[in-house]
Curated annotation (Swiss-Prot):
<comment type="similarity">
    <text>Belongs to the Musashi family.</text>
</comment>
<keyword id="KW-0597">Phosphoprotein</keyword>
<dbReference type="GO" id="GO:0140693">
    <property type="term" value="F:molecular condensate scaffold activity"/>
</dbReference>
<feature type="modified residue" description="Phosphoserine">
    <location>
        <position position="191"/>
    </location>
</feature>
<dbReference type="InterPro" id="IPR000504">
    <property type="entry name" value="RRM_dom"/>
</dbReference>
<dbReference type="GO" id="GO:0042803">
    <property type="term" value="F:protein homodimerization activity"/>
</dbReference>
<feature type="domain" description="RRM 1">
    <location>
        <begin position="20"/>
        <end position="110"/>
    </location>
</feature>
<dbReference type="InterPro" id="IPR034126">
    <property type="entry name" value="MSI_RRM2"/>
</dbReference>
<feature type="domain" description="RRM 2">
    <location>
        <begin position="109"/>
        <end position="186"/>
    </location>
</feature>
<dbReference type="InterPro" id="IPR035979">
    <property type="entry name" value="RBD_domain_sf"/>
</dbReference>
<dbReference type="GO" id="GO:0042802">
    <property type="term" value="F:identical protein binding"/>
</dbReference>
<dbReference type="GO" id="GO:0005737">
    <property type="term" value="C:cytoplasm"/>
</dbReference>
<keyword id="KW-0007">Acetylation</keyword>
<keyword id="KW-0539">Nucleus</keyword>
<feature type="modified residue" description="N-acetylmethionine">
    <location>
        <position position="1"/>
    </location>
</feature>
<dbReference type="GO" id="GO:0007417">
    <property type="term" value="P:central nervous system development"/>
</dbReference>
<dbReference type="GO" id="GO:0003729">
    <property type="term" value="F:mRNA binding"/>
</dbReference>
Amino acid sequence: METDAPQPGLASPDSPHDPCKMFIGGLSWQTTQEGLREYFGQFGEVKECLVMRDPLTKRSRGFGFVTFMDQAGVDKVLAQSRHELDSKTIDPKVAFPRRAQPKMVTRTKKIFVGGLSVNTTVEDVKQYFEQFGKVDDAMLMFDKTTNRHRGFGFVTFESEDIVEKVCEIHFHEINNKMVECKKAQPKEVMSPTGSARGRSRVMPYGMDAFMLGIGMLGYPGFQATTYASRSYTGLAPGYTYQFPEFRVERTPLPSAPVLPELTAIPLTAYGPMAAAAAAAAVVRGTGSHPWTMAPPPGSTPSRTGGFLGTTSPGPMAELYGAANQDSGVSSYISAASPAPSTGFGHSLGGPLIATAFTNGYH
């Protein structure tokens, strides 16, 4: 008989793992505890059976638990590839107790420092933070391949009070570069344990390493197995971050903008005058790309910029997008620039400064 008595949850945080207990998912709304017990009774003697129900509506929540007297019943259930109950395919798995979510560390002697410049050394970091109090240890995380640090590290102080003082100032300037400081957190806080529902899957329990700061989501996997990260929007421009492979590649800054090839868009598409002007610019050896129609240095342009008007044929509108389109250009703000501020719905006149940049970070 089913009862309206309060039903236990999945497991208390301290419940030991019972190898004879199974989680049964995908149950039909019509499946009862008696029906569940009867079905799984064919695999072995059932010690306990439970269909989880909503405490208010008393309706089934679509899953339950079955506990066998011995592990042989569990093995028989797992050996069968497909299970169907009440005209619905169900999904039995080995049940694992749910662990309590680790609490965030609020008192610690260790901080995470991110966004360090390439030429910053561990001595620079240690010397800077010594103004706040005694530094017990400082480290930068290095890539073994290049033997260069990856723009972040950790500093350990003598007391938690020093950390509180440092973290009151979120951004610090080291070697003319703004860096971010946060309290270091254990790995259990930074990376959720997830769930495990099969014998072959290993629960990621008990990695006791101290990890990265709260805001550090995406720094590279680095060559130190006792530390790890999940995702970071990036305080070190020019790097791509990949975790958990513990690899990162430095993306070199381009020395000059890459100009598009002319073969895709013939100059004749912009009219005979445009083609003639471009040809004349090349002949004069100005070094300007014909597409830009940029005047030679020292000359006075006939218009406020080198772009053609919106009445000109060609893919200019497609290249920059309309004002109501979700284009990359629309995410930039306008300012004084050689480019014209007219002729485009979204006002391109500007050096294309990304609005997402704040204090040098994004």
